[in-house]
Amino acid sequence: VLTDFGIPKVIGGSFNMMALDVYKQIIGQQNMSMGAVISILLLLPAVFVFIFDRIQSKRHARFQVFQAKPYVSASNKKLEVVLSLFCGVVSGAILLIIFTAVLASFIQSWPYDLSLTLAHYSFEYVDGGGWAAYFNSVRMALFSTVFGTTLIFMVALLTERFKAHPFIKNYVQALVLLPLAVPGLVLGIAYILFFNQQSNPLNVLYGTMTILVISTIVHYYTVPHLTLTNAIKQIPLQLDQAAQTLGTSKWKTFWKVYLPMCFPALCDVSVYIFVNAMTTVSAAIFLYSPDTSLAAVAVLNMDDAGDTVAAVAMSILILTTSCVVKLIHWLFTRKIMARSQQWRESSH
């Protein structure tokens, strides 16, 4: 919430936020120094909360009971009905907002001319990138999903299953948690200051799709890493010992054991990265070029230009794409994974 950028920019009006100040200083006034100062102020609360959470987690870890039995609560029909109604009201309110946006994207001129049209989806007379920006987002999301999932899985596997010095292991574990405490705006500014220097050999990456993919993977690295680490920890170490006894290579063990057993987590991580890559704004707003404009950035640009309905139409495209990917993931998990993951049921 503290570092949110998209919502305050669209509906915040004159109510100022630190995230908006960063954007105004860098994009509006080209004042990189002041933008960096505000970014540090924006970073401090997140770092303090992150450190506090780590201290509390270590403190509570000493009192964990590892041999616990699941608690089965007594059935309370009245309470269940009340909670179901409450959840239904909240879900209905969210769906109503989404339905309004979907309906508005098909209306000729809201709320004056309510005739239906597809003209807003042509993006022919609006700035922001149009369909090119949408396909850039899909391409960037696919690249981030493939390379990000592969990289994160390799790092998690090397950290958990291969012998390494305790210092290196602790350093990697601390490093992968760092993006969770760093706001996307701060990451974006850091990328500008580093990659935009002409003397930097990596300057060729600035303004390309590659830097957008890298920033997206780094920004959303922590949650997938923790997910895959937890999946790897569920695999018994005895399987490694058995494979070593049989003379099986590490590559074959990875291909025949780790990859199939971690496949559900890999699918979850892939969907997580894809959806977040489709909707990312905070870091990408500083890194895109006219050739690599993204759909989420195009929504902000269209809204700034007064093309609100076109911005809504682009938002619906992003939402639809994410929902389709999630639906494919759900069907794949339901149909195929049920057969490939029978070992989990037999182990209980």
PLM-predicted stretches and their roles:
Residues 75-84, 154-191, 348:
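Cytoplasmic-entry segments and transmembrane alpha-helices of multi-pass inner-membrane transporters
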Residues 8-13, 67-73, 107, 111, ...:
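Membrane-interfacial helix termini and adjacent extracytoplasmic/periplasmic loops
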